[in-house]
């Protein structure tokens, strides 16, 4: 199967090239990047060497669709929407890593991504409704039948996978959920950004986007679908001075305050027992971002405070892999009829 990587020179695209160049099921048919178009790949990225040393090409529907079956769109928010319909009309399947199709309503996207909406005059509400939310552990069957997959954001991935077992079975209350997350600097992308300079964020930790972070509404939308009830929650992200990694601590209130940590761990383990990339840790063992770095795994742990009936769920992922491109490859595998984890048997280089 021929795969076009559109936006190949950003962090998401670079990860995609690195993963697909080793995968016998796929051939990289197109590398797109407007700023570097006309240059050889190996000149730009000698550390991800490609034997045929292809040119990076200008991003256009004609170039992308010429020899490709699937387009992996690793583009800024808003830009994917300018290509998606035309690519679908030419028979390609599309996996979008941006937020353009994560919402079932175009109006909701315009409200949350108002800056992008002012630039990109979209009229594709039908595609928003058609797109499948690409969280493989939750939506595998729908992904297998889809032609347009909207990959989740990194923060939503780190929050929804831990929450899903407890929301879907009514174990926790719908009110009072709090998500406290930390992300490495690569979550901000590859473009220059003052707040991501070493002298700005090194040796420090800071919160940002309180209450109105864009991923809040994405988490709430999917959590509400999983629960069957409207969910409103608190989400606070933090920037930590590491290149990659994401850690989330999630708080909720148990409907049955008699449940123990062991009970909640067994439930979590049973829910994800068929997923090789999800590791449920023993009670009182808590995940570290170091354990998942450079892998597509998610480590989970759970603890109950029996004094007040509250549950604490923890997760750790690599934000560039399970939080982004690794998850996109999972979706690609499912759409192509392969094992979800094909080509993603990655090992951590601890420490």
From Swiss-Prot:
Its EC number is 1.2.1.38. Pathway: Amino-acid biosynthesis; L-arginine biosynthesis; N(2)-acetyl-L-ornithine from L-glutamate: step 3/4. Pfam families: Semialdhyde_dh (PF01118), Semialdhyde_dhC_1 (PF22698). One of its GO terms (molecular function) is N-acetyl-gamma-glutamyl-phosphate reductase activity. It comes from the Bacteria. One of its GO terms (biological process) is L-arginine biosynthetic process. Its main location: cytoplasm. It is found in: Cytoplasm. SMART domains: Semialdhyde_dh. Keywords: Amino-acid biosynthesis, Arginine biosynthesis, Cytoplasm, NADP, Oxidoreductase. One of its GO terms (cellular component) is cytoplasm. Coiled coil: none annotated. The active site is at residue 154. It catalyses: N-acetyl-L-glutamate 5-semialdehyde + phosphate + NADP(+) = N-acetyl-L-glutamyl 5-phosphate + NADPH + H(+). It is an enzyme of class 1 (oxidoreductase). InterPro entries: AGPR_AS (IPR023013), AGPR_type-1 (IPR000706), NAD(P)-bd_dom_sf (IPR036291), NAGSA_dehydrogenase (IPR050085), Semialdehyde_DH_NAD-bd (IPR000534). Signal peptide: none annotated. Belongs to the NAGSA dehydrogenase family. Type 1 subfamily. Catalyzes the NADPH-dependent reduction of N-acetyl-5-glutamyl phosphate to yield N-acetyl-L-glutamate 5-semialdehyde. HAMAP family: ArgC_type1. This is N-acetyl-gamma-glutamyl-phosphate reductase. It comes from Prochlorococcus marinus (strain MIT 9215).
